[in-house]
C-alpha cells in the first residue's frame, strides 16, 4: 500500500541535550508565519521570507517523510546521520503506547502531533541557512544573525523601540509599519497611557493631564514656573562658582531680580515637560514588566521627552530610542489637514493648525535634546526609508549588544553606540544608492568576493565572502586582492540583508579598493571565463550621505536640572535650515511614500504566491528577482532624459492642437496614438505590483507618458 508524505505544519526546535523529561521547556514551535516574521526580522525581504519559509517546510517534509498512524502519541523527530550529504537525513517516528489513550480524547491534539516535527537547533539553523543560500542571500555572518533573530522571536531576549517626536510627524504610522516589519505585535502609544490615567483623575482636579501637550503650558502658573526656574538656575550657579561672600551676594541679587515671566514658547515647553513627567512613570513600570517577560515592544508618543528617555535607559538596557521629526514646516502643516472635520487648515476649525507654533517649538526642543544625547534623528518625509533605516539600525544595535557593548553610556549620558550604528547605516545607503552587488570569482581561484559595482560597471569595492566549512561554520577569507590581473570566472547577483543598508555589517577595513572594468557583465551572466579583471585602481566611493556629526560637548550630566539651563536661552529659529538636509536630497526623499506592498500583512503574501503562479513562469520569476543587474546606467539615463524631453514636447503640442481643432481631427489623433500604444499595452499586461523598480523608459519610449497622452485624447472625445 502506497504511503503518503507527512504533512508538516509545525517545527519544534529543541536545544542540544534537551531530553523528553523537560516537557519542552527549552523548545519552541515554529509555524510558517512565525518563521517568515523571523526571516523578516533578520533583514530578508517580505516576499523572499514568505518563499524561504515555504522552502524550509518543503525540505523537512521531503527529506524526512514517513507514514505516521493516528495512534502515534509523540511528534516525529529528525535525526542527523553522520556523514550524510544533506542536513536532514531521516525522520524517526516515535510511538509511546502510554499516550495513545490520552490523545484519543483530544482529536485536535492528535492531529497537531501528527503534523509536528521535532528538530535540533543545529539542524534547524542548517536548513534555514541552506534555504537562504538558494535565494542568493549573502551576509557577513548570516548564521549568527539567524540565531539572534530566533532568540528575539522565542522571547529569550527582547528589544524596546522608542519613537519620540511631536504631534503630526508620523509616529503612529511608522510604529505600525515597524511592528509589522519586526514581527512585534505589541505597539503602544503614550496617548493610551495618558487616556488610562485620565480615568483616575477628574478634569477639574488635574487639568494639566486632560490638556494636550502643545497647550499644556496654559494650565501652569507662570509666576510659580518662573520662580522655580530662577531658583534652580541660582542653585547651579552657586555650585559652580563656589561658596563665597561675593557669589552669595550676586546670587541673592539675581534671585530678587529674575522673577520676570517666561515667554509663551518657554511656557509651552514647560507644560509639555510637566505632562510628560506624569506619563513617564507609568511607562517605566510597563517596560519593567515587558523586560521581565522578554516581550519586544514598540512605543511611540509625544511624551517621550529625551531627558526622561535617558533616565529610562539607565534602568532598561533593551531600549533603542529614535527621534522622529519633519524638517519642512509646510509639509508638517499639511499633515494636520486630515485631522480636521472638514479637511481644512483654517485655525478656527483645526486646533493643530492653531497651535502649530507650539508644536514646532516642542519639536525644536526635542531635536536639541537629541543632538545633545546623540539620539538618532529620522526625518520622516519618506516612510519607506524611515522604516528601513530604523529596522537596520535596531538589528545592528542587537548585534553589538550580543558582543557585550552597552547601548547607553553612563559617563556621558549619551547613546553613542546607537548613533554610530545609525550613521553607519546612512553611510552604507549613501555608498550603495547607485551601486550594484555581485559575487565574483576569478579564474583558477576558489575565493569569492562580493563586489560593489559602480553605474559604469567598474568595481568600486570588494569584500571577501565567508564560505561554509565541513562543520558548517563560516570560514572568512582573509586574503586580500593584490591588484594583479585575473580572469573573471563567475559573476552572479546576490541579495543582501536589509537591502543596501546591509553593507554596513561588512567591515570597511576588510574591503579592497581595486577596481576593474566589467562593463559587459549582466545579472544573468554566470560564466564569463574569458573576461579579464583589470587592475586599474579606483578609490572606493566615500559616503556623502546624511550623517550626524559628533557633538563637541559629549559629557552631559543626566539630571533634569542641568537640562533646564539650555531652555532659558531657547528660541525658535526663523528658518528650518538647521534641521533640514540638503534641498536636493530632501526633494528626492519626499517623492517616496508608503509603498503598496510595504503595508501588506503576512497573510496577504499567500495571494502574492497565487499571482506568481498565475502570471509568471519560473524563468520570469527568477529574472524579476530584486537583484541588481549589471546594466550601464549612464546610457540609460541619457536616453531617458532625451525621451522625456521629446515626450513633453509632443504632449504639449498635442494638447494645444486638441483644444482648438474639431472633433474629427481629435478622433484621428486618438486612433493614431492608440495604435502606437499597442505594443506597450501588451507589455504592460505582464507587469506586476512589485515591479515598481523597473524603469518606465523602454524601446517604445515612456509608457507612463504615453498612457497620460492616451487619457488626454480620451478626455477630448
Swiss-Prot record:
Superkingdom to which the source organism belongs: Eukaryota
Positions with biased composition (Acidic residues): 559-582
Biased composition (Basic and acidic residues): 583-602
InterPro entries: P-loop_NTPase
Annotated spans, Disordered: 235-259, 532-629
Mutant phenotype after disruption: No visible phenotype under normal growth conditions and normal levels of phytic acid in seeds.
SUPFAM superfamilies with a match to the protein in the record: P-loop containing nucleoside triphosphate hydrolases
Biased composition (Polar residues): 243-259, 532-545
Entry function: May be not required for the accumulation of phytic acid in seeds. Phytic acid is the primary storage form of phosphorus in cereal grains and other plant seeds.
Protein known as: P-loop NTPase domain-containing protein LPA1 homolog 2
Amino acid at each position: 500500500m502506497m504511503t503518503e508524505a507527512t504533512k508538516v505544519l509545525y517545527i519544534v526546535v529543541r536545544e542540544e541535550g534537551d531530553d523528553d523529561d523537560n516537557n519542552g521547556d527549552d523548545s519552541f514551535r515554529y509555524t510558517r508565519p512565525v518563521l517568515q516574521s523571523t526571516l523578516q526580522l533578520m533583514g530578508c525581504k517580505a516576499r523572499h521570507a514568505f518563499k524561504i519559509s515555504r522552502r524550509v517546510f518543503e525540505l523537512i517534509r521531503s527529506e524526512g517523510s514517513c507514514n505516521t498512524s493516528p495512534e502515534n502519541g509523540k511528534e516525529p523527530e529528525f535525526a542527523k546521520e553522520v556523514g550524510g550529504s544533506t542536513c536532514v537525513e531521516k525522520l524517526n517516528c516515535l510511538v509511546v503506547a502510554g499516550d495513545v489513550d490520552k490523545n484519543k480524547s483530544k482529536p485536535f491534539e492528535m492531529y497537531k502531533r501528527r503534523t509536528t516535527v521535532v528538530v535540533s537547533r543545529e539542524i534547524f539553523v542548517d536548513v534555514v541557512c541552506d534555504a537562504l543560500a538558494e535565494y542568493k542571500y549573502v551576509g557577513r555572518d548570516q548564521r549568527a544573525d539567524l540565531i539572534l533573530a530566533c532568540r528575539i522571536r522565542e522571547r529569550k531576549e527582547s528589544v524596546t523601540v522608542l519613537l519620540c517626536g511631536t504631534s503630526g510627524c508620523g509616529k503612529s504610522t511608522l510604529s505600525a509599519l515597524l511592528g509589522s516589519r519586526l514581527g512585534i505585535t505589541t505597539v503602544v502609544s503614550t496617548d493610551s497611557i495618558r487616556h488610562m490615567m485620565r480615568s483616575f483623575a477628574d478634569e477639574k482636579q488635574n487639568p494639566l493631564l486632560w490638556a494636550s501637550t502643545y497647550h499644556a503650558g496654559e494650565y501652569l502658573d507662570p509666576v510659580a514656573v518662573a520662580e522655580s526656574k530662577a531658583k534652580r538656575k541660582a542653585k547651579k550657579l552657586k555650585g559652580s562658582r563656589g561658596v563665597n561672600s561675593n557669589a552669595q551676594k550676586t546670587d541673592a541679587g539675581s534671585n530678587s531680580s529674575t522673577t520676570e515671566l517666561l515667554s509663551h514658547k518657554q511656557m509651552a515647553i514647560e507644560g509639555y515637560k510637566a505632562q510628560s513627567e506624569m506619563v513617564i512613570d507609568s511607562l517605566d513600570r510597563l517596560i519593567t514588566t515587558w523586560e521581565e517577560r522578554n516581550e519586544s515592544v514598540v512605543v511611540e508618543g509625544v511624551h517621550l521627552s529625551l531627558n526622561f528617555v535617558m533616565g529610562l535607559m539607565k534602568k532598561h538596557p533593551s531600549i533603542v530610542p529614535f527621534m522622529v521629526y519633519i524638517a519642512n514646516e509646510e509639509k508638517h502643516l499639511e499633515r494636520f489637514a486630515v485631522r480636521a472635520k472638514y479637511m481644512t487648515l483654517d485655525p478656527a476649525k483645526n486646533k493643530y493648525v492653531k497651535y502649530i507654533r507650539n508644536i514646532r517649538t516642542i519639536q525644536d526642543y526635542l531635536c536639541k535634546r537629541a543632538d545633545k544625547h546623540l539620539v538618532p534623528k529620522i526625518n520622516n518625509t519618506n516612510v519607506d526609508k524611515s522604516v528601513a533605516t530604523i529596522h537596520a539600525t535596531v538589528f545592528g544595535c542587537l548585534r553589538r549588544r550580543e558582543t557585550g557593548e552597552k547601548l547607553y553610556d553612563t559617563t556621558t549620558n549619551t547613546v553613542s553606540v546607537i548613533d554610530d550604528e545609525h550613521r553607519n547605516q546612512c553611510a552604507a545607503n549613501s555608498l550603495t544608492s547607485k551601486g550594484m552587488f555581485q559575487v565574483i570569482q576569478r579564474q583558477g581561484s576558489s575565493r569569492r568576493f562580493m563586489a560593489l559595482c559602480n553605474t559604469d560597471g567598474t568595481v568600486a569595492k570588494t569584500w571577501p565572502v565567508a564560505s561554509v566549512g565541513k562543520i558548517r561554520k563560516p570560514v572568512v577569507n582573509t586574503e586580500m586582492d593584490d591588484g594583479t590581473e585575473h580572469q573573471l570566472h563567475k559573476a552572479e547577483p546576490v541579495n543582501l540583508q536589509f537591502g543596501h543598508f546591509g553593507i554596513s555589517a561588512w567591515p570597511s577595513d576588510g574591503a579592497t579598493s581595486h577596481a576593474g572594468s566589467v562593463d559587459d557583465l549582466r545579472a544573468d551572466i554566470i560564466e564569463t571565463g574569458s573576461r579579464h579583471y583589470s587592475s586599474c585602481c579606483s578609490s572606493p566611493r566615500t559616503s556623502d550621505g546624511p550623517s550626524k556629526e559628533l557633538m563637541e560637548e559629549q559629557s552631559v550630566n543626566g539630571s533634569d536640572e542641568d537640562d533646564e539651563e539650555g531652555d532659558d536661552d531657547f528660541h525658535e529659529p526663523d528658518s528650518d535650515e538647521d534641521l533640514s538636509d540638503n534641498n536636493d536630497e530632501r526633494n528626492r526623499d519626499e517623492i517616496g511614500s508608503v509603498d503598496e506592498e510595504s503595508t501588506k500583512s503576512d497573510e496577504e503574501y499567500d495571494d502574492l504566491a497565487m499571482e506568481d503562479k498565475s502570471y509568471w513562469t519560473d524563468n520570469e520569476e527568477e529574472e524579476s528577482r530584486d537583484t541588481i543587474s549589471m546594466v550601464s546606467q549612464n546610457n540609460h539615463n541619457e536616453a531617458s532624459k532625451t525621451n522625456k524631453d521629446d515626450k513633453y514636447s509632443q504632449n504639449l503640442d498635442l494638447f494645444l492642437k486638441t483644444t482648438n481643432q474639431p472633433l474629427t481631427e481629435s478622433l484621428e489623433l486618438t486612433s493614431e496614438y492608440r495604435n502606437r500604444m499597442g505594443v506597450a499595452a501588451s507589455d504592460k499586461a505582464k507587469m506586476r505590483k512589485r515591479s515598481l523598480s523597473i524603469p518606465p523608459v523602454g524601446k517604445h519610449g515612456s509608457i507612463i507618458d504615453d498612457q497620460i497622452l492616451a487619457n488626454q485624447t480620451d478626455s477630448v472625445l
